[in-house]
């Protein structure tokens, strides 16, 4: 079986400081021989300690494991503040990291039915017309 306590080596390359987006950008190489992939949450913690930042300032994505395992490569962004992270990161990545709530919307079928109901009535009195149509 794989040992989950074995050491993991993190290497960063292509390090760029991006002052316009107030972040540091890098490619991360994770060496984990004889061990399963490291979780994104654990990776965020390790990068935060390496770069003296808070865990909620780090965003990790695009992790790909090489064939045969043992080495994973991905991207990491370390923002100067949690506010900058919330401002510039895509919403889906914030949801994945648990920094934003997922917006629950109606099912596709319900949205289409509502759209078609509203299409049958035109003008400003859509709500009144919908009620009148139901009463008939």
UniProtKB/Swiss-Prot annotation:
Positions of disulphide bridges: none
Gene Ontology MF: a single term: methyltransferase activity
SUPFAM superfamilies (UniProt xref): Ribosomal proteins S24e, L23 and L15e
This protein's UniProt keywords: Cytoplasm, Methyltransferase, Ribonucleoprotein, Ribosomal protein, Transferase
Region called Disordered, residue ranges: 105-136
GO cellular component, one term: ribonucleoprotein complex
Annotated GO biological process: methylation; translation
InterPro entries in the cross-refs: eRP_eS24_sf, Ribosomal_eS24, Ribosomal_eS24_CS, Ribosomal_uL23/eL15/eS24_sf
Family: Belongs to the eukaryotic ribosomal protein eS24 family.
Quaternary structure note: Component of the small ribosomal subunit. Mature ribosomes consist of a small (40S) and a large (60S) subunit.
Protein name: Small ribosomal subunit protein eS24
Organism: Chaetomium thermophilum (strain DSM 1495 / CBS 144.50 / IMI 039719) (Thermochaetoides thermophila)
């Amino acid at each position: 079986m794989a040992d989950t306590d074995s050491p993991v080596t993190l290497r960063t390359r292509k390090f760029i400081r991006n002052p316009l987006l107030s972040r540091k950008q890098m490619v991360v190489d994770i060496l984990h021989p004889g061990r399963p992939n490291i979780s994104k949450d654990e990776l965020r913690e390790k990068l935060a300690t390496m770069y003296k930042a808070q865990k909620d300032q780090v965003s990790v994505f695009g992790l790909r494991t090489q064939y045969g395992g043992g080495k994973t490569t991905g991207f990491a962004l370390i923002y100067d503040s949690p506010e900058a992270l919330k401002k510039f990161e895509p919403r889906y990545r914030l949801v994945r990291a648990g920094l934003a709530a997922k917006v629950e919307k109606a099912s596709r079928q319900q949205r289409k039915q509502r759209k078609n109901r509203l299409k049958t009535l035109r003008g400003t009195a859509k709500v009144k017309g919908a009620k009148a149509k139901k009463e008939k």
